[in-house]
Amino acid sequence: MPRAFLVKKPCVSTCKRNWSELPDEERGEIYVPVSLGFCPPQPYQEPEPSVAEPPSCPLALDMSLRNSSYSVTPGPCVVAQLPSEDMSRLAGPQSRDHGFLRTKMKVTLGDGPSGDLFTCHICQKAFTYQRMLNRHMKCHNDVKRHLCTYCGKGFNDTFDLKRHVRTHTGVRPYKCSLCDKAFTQRCSLESHLKKIHGVQQKYAYKERRAKLYVCEECGCTSESQEGHVLHLKEHHPDSPLLRKTSKKVAVALQNTVTSLLQGAHHV
C-alpha cells in the first residue's frame, strides 16, 4: 500500500517557492503538486430555484461555464501529498493530462542579486539572470538551428554543436600533463585530475579561467587569439573560421590604434 495520503485543503493558487532557502530537516521528503487540487465528479442534480453560490473550486466554475445546460455541485477540493519515491508514478501520460505544476522548483543560483528569480514557464526552473533564462529556453525549441555536418544531429547552441563535432573528428585539446589521456572538454580534464591524480584546482569557485583557443581542424591549442589566427593562416588557409576570426582581430586592432591616437592627441 503506498504511503500517499490525502489532506483536505481549500484550493490554493499557483505559488512559487524557493526550496533552497529551507534546511534539509525542515524541507522533508514531501512534494505537493498544486494543480492536483481538483473536484471529484458529482452526480447530476436538478437545479434548485434558490440562487446558487459560486463554486469554490475554479475547475468546477470553468466546467459550469462551458456547459450551461446543467449545474455541477462543487465538492470539497482535495490536495494530495505524495512522498518523493512515488514521483515515478506521476511520469505517465495520465499525469501529463492534469498539467501538474511543480512547487519544488530547481533553482540555478549564481553570483547575481538576491532579487526576483526568472522562472521558465515550461519546466518551472528558476534562474537569477534573464540571460541565463534566455539560454535555457533554447532547449525547449523544437527547431534546432545548428546541425552537425557529419550525422545531421541538431543543437540549439554553437557550444553544444562544437562539443558534439569533436566526437566525430577525434579532437581532444585538453591533455593531462601527468598521463597520456586527453579530453574533449575542460571539465572532464579537471575531473580526471581530481579523481585520478588528486590534483586540486587553484582557481576559486566560479572564477573565470584563461580561455584556450582550439583549432577544430587538428586540435592545436593557443593561449591567445593572435596565435590562433596565425596558426590558421599557416596550416589551414582555407578554413571558414579564418575569415570570421580575422575580422574580429582587425576590429580589435583598429580600436586599440584609435584609443592610442586619441590619447596622444590629448597629450
Swiss-Prot record:
Gene3D superfamilies: Classic Zinc Finger. GO terms for molecular function: DNA-binding transcription factor activity, RNA polymerase II-specific; RNA polymerase II cis-regulatory region sequence-specific DNA binding; zinc ion binding. It is found in: Nucleus. Its main location: nucleus. A zinc finger (C2H2-type) spans 118-140, 146-168, 174-197, 213-235. Keywords: DNA-binding, Metal-binding, Nucleus, Repeat, Transcription, Transcription regulation, Zinc, Zinc-finger. GO terms for biological process: epidermal cell differentiation; regulation of transcription by RNA polymerase II. GO terms for cellular component: nucleus. Pfam families: zf-C2H2, zf-H2C2_2. Putative transcription factor. Involved in hair formation and spermatogenesis. May function in the differentiation and/or maintenance of the urogenital system. This is Putative transcription factor Ovo-like 1. It comes from Bos taurus. The lineage of its organism: Eukaryota, Metazoa, Chordata, Craniata, Vertebrata. The gene is OVOL1.
